[in-house]
Amino acid sequence: MTKVGLRIDVDTFRGTREGVPRLLETLSKYNIQASIFFSVGPDNMGRHLWRLVKPQFLWKMLRSNAASLYGWDILLAGTAWPGKEIGHANADIIREAAKHHEVGLHAWDHHAWQAHSGNWDRQTMVDDIARGLRTLEEIIGQPVTCSAAAGWRADQQVIEAKEAFHLRYNSDCRGAMPFRPLLESGKPGTAQIPVTLPTWDEVIGRDVKAEDFNGWLLNRILRDKGTPVYTIHAEVEGCAYQHNFVDLLKRAAQEGVTFCPLSELLSETLPLGQVVRGNIAGREGWLGCQQIAGSR
């Protein structure tokens, strides 16, 4: 039996309003629990359109057929008008998710974090995280114990900023296995549970065809030598490619693959490491990557 952490990122208003209820229904049908990370502030995702001037981002949008994948409402959100606030407008949906699944913070403003957090000072970052956590806790009526940085935009600054909130774990980077990042003080920080597997949009049209994706992914899962963690998006697997996700769950069960919330992957003792800026094939720009302590 292979155990895989299932992380669901919710980036947008439509992903929350339409994608999450569909995913909740699917997960209930297959008796699966996951970790769901919500963006709760304004939906300004359309402001990423300026990145089309960057060849790597443009190619990603073209090969993944982004207009069909996400829809024009997502691609234009927050461009010619202020972005709609996601959290309180979809509070019932978020509360329903929290009844059955592990719920954490993805971002206050997903676009702002992904586009600008790399240049923020620490206090700006702490204030932004606090605003998101406060809003999510108001909605679900209980403490939030985990978070996942939007777009995996994380480095030492993010690690230090999140220590102020005493979360159980964060999932801010890409890597191979859970670990504790070293703080500037030399002490181990809050556990990190990295994503180990590629997302749909990172590989479609580059490494694999859409119709072959599930078999390709299951092969990667079964060959994973670390602690497999897979991320889906409410805007993709909860909307245009929900049928593909359902097929993945069916095939995974046949292969002896089970999915679980990320917290079930934690253990009493974890290796030490760091979160450093790096690059991942198929994704434009830098993102946080696991580095084992002592390696370079």
Curated annotation (Swiss-Prot):
Pathway(s) served: Glycolipid biosynthesis; 4-amino-4-deoxy-alpha-L-arabinose undecaprenyl phosphate biosynthesis; 4-amino-4-deoxy-alpha-L-arabinose undecaprenyl phosphate from UDP-4-deoxy-4-formamido-beta-L-arabinose and undecaprenyl phosphate: step 2/2; Bacterial outer membrane biogenesis; lipopolysaccharide biosynthesis
Domain NodB homology: 2-260
Keyword terms, alphabetized: Antibiotic resistance, Hydrolase, Lipid A biosynthesis, Lipid biosynthesis, Lipid metabolism, Lipopolysaccharide biosynthesis
Its EC number(s): 3.5.1.n3
CDD domains: CE4_ArnD (cd10939)
One MF term in the entry's GO annotations: hydrolase activity, acting on carbon-nitrogen (but not peptide) bonds, in linear amides
Domain of life: Bacteria
InterPro entries for this protein: ArnD, Glyco_hydro/deAcase_b/a-brl, NODB_dom, Polysacc_deacetylase_ArnD
Keyword Lipid metabolism found: yes
BP term (GO), one: response to antibiotic
Catalytic activity entry: 4-deoxy-4-formamido-alpha-L-arabinopyranosyl di-trans,octa-cis-undecaprenyl phosphate + H2O = 4-amino-4-deoxy-alpha-L-arabinopyranosyl di-trans,octa-cis-undecaprenyl phosphate + formate
GO cellular component terms, semicolon-separated: membrane
Top class in the EC scheme: hydrolase
HAMAP family recorded: ArnD
Function of the protein: Catalyzes the deformylation of 4-deoxy-4-formamido-L-arabinose-phosphoundecaprenol to 4-amino-4-deoxy-L-arabinose-phosphoundecaprenol. The modified arabinose is attached to lipid A and is required for resistance to polymyxin and cationic antimicrobial peptides.
PANTHER family: 4-DEOXY-4-FORMAMIDO-L-ARABINOSE-PHOSPHOUNDECAPRENOL DEFORMYLASE ARND-RELATED, GLYCOSYL TRANSFERASE-RELATED
Family: Belongs to the polysaccharide deacetylase family. ArnD deformylase subfamily.
Protein's name in the database: Probable 4-deoxy-4-formamido-L-arabinose-phosphoundecaprenol deformylase ArnD
